[in-house]
Amino acid sequence: MRIDEGKLPRMKSVKVVGDHAVSLRFESGKNFTVDLREIVFGSKGLRKLRDGEVFARVSLGEGGHSLEWPGELDIGADTVWELALRQNGHADAAEFIRWRWKHGLSLTEAAEALGMSRRQIAYYVSGEHEVPRTVLLACKGWETERQAVA
């Protein structure tokens, strides 16, 4: 599976590399170091992970669709992917992904909304292509038009 096919990101490996940081390898072949403090310390539901010994017990969830810890604690791969992009120089892709999530748009629906090809949208989501400022502005314009109609 490749992320640009529109499937949810899947992780192949995880290793703790620092204070609430993990090194991840995604099925797409991309490797990122991700600092999870923002999520861990920003979520009451994950407060047990603030303990470094508990955090160090991270493992991959079934199929690589999440990071899991004992006690039924987990963080979804899509959330980790967005954070990985944002922290590793792809803030444009992260912003684009958040726009899609906010409006519940599939790759095809996002392509139709912006008058672009589905493949190009997939490239943006995967971080393979930079999301041009004009596209991010088009997202805001689409959102504004949609709000005006509602």
Residues covered by each model-derived region:
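Motif-centric detector for short Cys/His coordination patterns
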Residues: 1-150
